[in-house]
Amino acid sequence: MINCGVQEPNIVNIAAGLASQGKRVIVYGVAGFVLYKAYEQIKLNIKGWAEHSGSVIFVNAGANGCYNALGRGHLLDDDALLMKALDIPLYDPIDRSTFVRYVKEGLQQTGVRYIRLGWDNEVWRKKE
């Protein structure tokens, strides 16, 4: 586990380097920070060459608008379009078990995937 704090472009570059060596990487972020701040790194370093060797799973919380009250920077309103533009499959799990399944599947495959999460409802709080 590597925590780069609010250095989204750097964590994507680290993920690209690890994936290029065959590693399986999960990049977690809140709202649109990873996608918006590091889009060029995702485009060039993940899609450009790292996806062919390893696995990168982007997990992004806040898809249901639970962070919107924190301001424009926390809005996640066009993430699906950004991922589609890069031909990155989008997964939108409805509960914890579906999320776990998507992550396990992603770790077994080479390539990139994007999982968007919402946290502020009873389905996500319920432990299975």
Feature map (PLM): residue ranges:
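Glycine-rich oxoanion-binding loops at beta->alpha junctions
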Residues: 6-8, 12
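Conserved thiamine diphosphate
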Residues: 7, 17-128
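Short pre-catalytic strand/loop immediately N-terminal to key active-site residues, enriched for Gly-Thr
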Residues: 1-3
